[in-house]
């Protein structure tokens, strides 16, 4: 028989210990919707409130620098937005994939396997998720040394932290084998951005600098990503469908240029 507890008080000003995933300061006599509304109103009126979500601080680590001139660097593109060749040959799941695929930049066509955003914009133009056209143009111009002729893709939506870290380790090991100098990661929705962030962190632990492009920059920063560029929208981080084709390309190019510039900056963490 469980003993009834009247209140479990918060300790926002003091230290507390966690036992597993149990949060020790929630008043469970109020329903979750009531507690959520109380927090929302407190935030709106500028009053103090205590989040029920405990986030571990990002671990302190050194931030890798680009080891060569950008004009000689080999850049790899990665996305957590579920871009796959037409027909989805690897049967990439649309949620919580837990695996990744390696695909050519020269496929005849692409589709998206991802339940975290409206994929119609990317299926209309995949460059809105993965800026292949802008990167290829910058390669031709000599702004970068080489764009890898393939990209890595996974589906980050609904992927837990633990699974994201495990996936990140697998991808990082693959990246090392391909001898690249830097990585650009493009991300979609919230949990997908979180997954992409952990992938980037694991790659950086191997000494390769990463820039993450996402509309949800706060998530990436809170996870501990060193270099983050704000994308336009979770449905098209590197696109702007309202613009004409040339205008959208120039918009995407500016995002890519900003990301590449960040690779040349020295970050302190």
Question: What are the roles of these predicted feature ranges?
Answer:
Residues 1-269:
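An N-terminal assembly and electron-transfer interface module characteristic of large anaerobic redox
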């Amino acid at each position: 028989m469980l003993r009834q507890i009247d209140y479990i008080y918060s300790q926002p000003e003091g230290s507390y210990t966690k036992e597993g995933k149990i949060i020790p300061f929630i008043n469970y006599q109020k329903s979750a919707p009531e507690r959520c509304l109380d927090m929302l109103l407190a935030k709106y009126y500028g009053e103090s409130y205590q989040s029920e979500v405990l986030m571990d601080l990002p671990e302190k680590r050194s931030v890798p620098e680009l080891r060569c001139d950008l004009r000689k660097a080999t850049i790899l593109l990665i996305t957590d937005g579920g871009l796959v060749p037409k027909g989805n040959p690897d049967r990439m799941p649309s949620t919580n994939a837990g695996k990744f695929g390696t695909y050519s930049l020269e496929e005849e066509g692409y589709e998206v396997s991802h339940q975290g955003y409206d994929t119609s914009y990317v299926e209309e133009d995949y460059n809105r998720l993965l800026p292949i056209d802008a990167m290829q143009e910058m390669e031709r111009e000599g702004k970068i040394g080489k764009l890898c002729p393939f990209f890595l893709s996974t589906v980050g939506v609904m992927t837990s932290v633990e699974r994201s870290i495990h996936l990140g380790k697998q991808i990082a090991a693959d990246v090392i084998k391909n001898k690249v100098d830097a990585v650009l990661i493009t991300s979609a929705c919230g949990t997908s951005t979180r997954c992409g962030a952990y992938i980037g962190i694991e790659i950086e632990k191997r000494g390769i600098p990463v820039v993450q492009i996402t509309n949800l920059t706060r998530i990436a920063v809170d996870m501990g990503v060193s270099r983050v560029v704000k994308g336009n929208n979770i449905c098209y981080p590197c696109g702007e469908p309202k613009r004409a084709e040339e205008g959208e390309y120039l918009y995407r190019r500016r995002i890519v240029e900003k990301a590449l510039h960040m690779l040349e900056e020295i970050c302190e963490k």
